[in-house]
Amino acid sequence: VYKRQGQNVVAADRITVEREARERQDQQVTILIHKPMGYVSGQAEDGHEPAVVLVTPQNHWNQDTSRTRFNFAQLKGLAPCGRLDIDSVGLLVMTQDGRVARQIIGEDSEMDKEYLVRVTYGDRDIDVQSVFPAEQLARLCHGLSLDGEALKPAKVDWQNPEQLRFVLT
């Protein structure tokens, strides 16, 4: 029986989760959507709608074999796992389950996140790869920072002559 937070246990102790807690956990949803351009990942901002408005019964995958069916209560507490800019398109994972979020974006996450980025260099937007300096590509792999903090190294290579593929862990 749970007595207090942080209670110590020994190997011989038996730990179970009460049925009510399991059922509550089972009711949490994770939703995958393809975010189109023009929507923000999280809260509405600057007059732009959040991607969560795209989650409707009409957009439910028709081959879903789970017994879970859409209801508007599922939108409460739904948070994006990561961020796609308003001009970005791609897979957006939204969840009510903190365990899922930590697996995807937690500090210790080892899950790769892949981005394709259309590149211009100077006034060149066709066959950019042929004029893009190799040292700048190397810098993209090891010299990125955000808000003054160095980021983990990224894998960066050419997807095609106009697009770079970034893989972030």
Over which residues does each language-model region extend?
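Basic, flexible Lys/Arg- and Gly-enriched helix-loop patches that mediate nucleic-acid binding at interfaces
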Residues: 3-169
